[in-house]
C-alpha cells in the first residue's frame, strides 16, 4: 500500500534524512511543505522531530495552527523563540534579507540537532524562482527531501490528498517581514497589527477562498497599507465586495489602517522582487 501511495523517490529521500535511530528532524514552519514532509515521514514509520521557530515575524495564529497540526499527527513540536528584529545587519541586507534571516535562524536550529541531519520543506518549484534563503540552506548543509525527490507543489498536494492529510490545499502565508520593502525594519507593534489584520480578513466569509497579503510598500508613508488580492482567487467576488471588506477592516483597526487601498494583481508572491 505504501509503495503505491508514496513514490519510491520520496521514500528514498526521506530514508536518507533519517539518522541511525530512524529519526527525521525537520525545520517545521507549519506550512504545507514542511507539514507534508512531517506527515509522510510519520506515515513511513519514522520518528519525527519538529523544530518550530516562533517570534514576532510569525503570526501567533500560524504558530498555534502549526502546533495543533503537529499534535494531530501525534508529534509534540519543539518551540524555539527567535527574534529576527535583533539581527543587526538585516535591514541593510537588501534583497538578501531572507538569506541573512534564514542563516541566523537555521544556525539556532542546527545547535539543537548537532548529531542529526536537519531537513526543511524546500520543494522542486522553489529551485526555479528567486529564493535567496536557499543560499543559507546550502551553506549550512540543510537537506531538502522534497526537492531531491522532484516533488513540487502539484505533487505535494496530490500525494497529500491520496494520504488523506488534512488541508492539502493549504495556502502559503510567508514570514511577516515579507510584507515590507527591502531595507525596512518594522517594529513589533506593526508586525502584530499585520498578523491581526490578516487573521481578521481570513475570518470573513467573503474571504474564504481569497488569496491576499497586507503590505506596507512605501517607506515614505509608513502608515499607508495596501491589501493585495490575487485576481484568480476572486472566484466571482466583485471588486466592490472586496472594497467593502477593506472598509470594514479599516474600521476594525482604526486609526492604524485608515490609509488603506486595495490592489488586485495577477501574481501575489514576489511583489518586492518585481518592484526592485
Predicted region positions:
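Anaerobic metallocofactor- and corrinoid-dependent redox/one-carbon enzyme cores
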Residues: 206-209, 216-217, 221, 243-247
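Mid-to-C-terminal catalytic subdomains of enzymes
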Residues: 151-213
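ATP-dependent adenylation/nucleotidyltransferase module used to activate substrates
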Residues: 1-162, 247-257, 264-276
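Short glycine/threonine-rich loop-to-helix capping motif typified by GTGT followed
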Residues: 185-191, 233-242, 271-276
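Flexible glycine/acidic-rich beta-alpha junction loops that bind and position SAM and/or redox cofactors
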Residues: 172-184, 220-224, 267-271
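Short amphipathic alpha-helices in soluble, non-transmembrane regions
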Residues: 197, 238-251
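Short, aliphatic-rich beta-strand segments
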Residues: 218-233
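Short secondary-structure junctions
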Residues: 19, 201-211, 251-259
Amino acid at each position: 500500500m505504501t509503495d503505491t501511495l508514496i513514490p519510491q523517490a520520496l521514500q528514498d529521500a526521506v530514508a536518507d534524512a533519517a539518522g541511525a535511530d530512524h529519526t527525521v528532524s525537520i525545520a517545521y514552519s507549519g506550512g504545507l511543505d514542511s507539514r507534508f514532509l512531517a506527515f509522510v515521514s510519520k506515515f513511513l514509520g519514522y520518528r519525527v522531530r519538529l523544530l518550530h521557530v516562533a517570534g514576532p515575524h510569525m503570526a501567533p495564529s500560524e504558530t498555534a495552527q502549526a502546533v495543533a497540526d503537529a499534535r494531530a499527527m501525534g508529534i509534540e513540536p519543539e518551540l524555539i523563540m527567535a527574534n529576527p528584529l535583533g539581527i543587526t545587519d538585516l535591514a541593510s541586507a537588501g534583497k538578501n534579507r531572507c538569506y541573512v534571516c534564514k542563516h541566523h535562524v537555521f544556525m539556532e536550529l542546527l545547535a539543537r540537532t548537532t548529531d542529526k541531519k536537519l531537513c526543511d520543506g524546500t520543494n522542486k518549484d522553489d529551485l526555479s524562482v528567486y529564493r535567496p534563503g536557499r543560499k543559507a540552506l546550502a551553506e549550512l548543509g540543510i537537506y531538502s527531501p522534497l526537492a531531491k525527490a522532484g516533488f513540487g507543489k502539484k505533487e505535494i498536494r496530490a500525494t497529500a490528498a491520496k494520504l488523506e492529510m488534512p488541508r492539502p490545499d493549504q495556502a502559503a502565508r510567508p514570514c511577516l517581514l515579507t510584507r515590507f520593502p527591502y531595507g525596512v525594519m518594522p517594529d513589533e507593534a506593526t508586525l502584530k497589527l499585520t498578523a491581526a489584520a490578516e487573521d481578521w480578513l481570513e475570518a470573513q466569509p467573503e474571504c474564504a477562498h481569497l488569496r491576499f497579503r497586507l503590505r506596507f510598500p512605501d517607506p515614505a508613508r509608513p502608515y499607508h497599507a495596501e491589501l493585495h488580492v490575487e485576481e484568480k482567487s476572486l472566484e466571482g467576488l466583485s471588486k466592490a465586495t472586496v472594497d467593502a471588506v477593506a472598509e470594514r477592516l479599516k474600521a476594525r483597526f482604526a486609526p492604524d489602517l485608515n490609509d488603506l487601498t486595495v490592489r488586485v494583481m495577477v501574481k501575489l508572491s514576489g511583489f518586492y522582487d518585481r518592484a526592485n
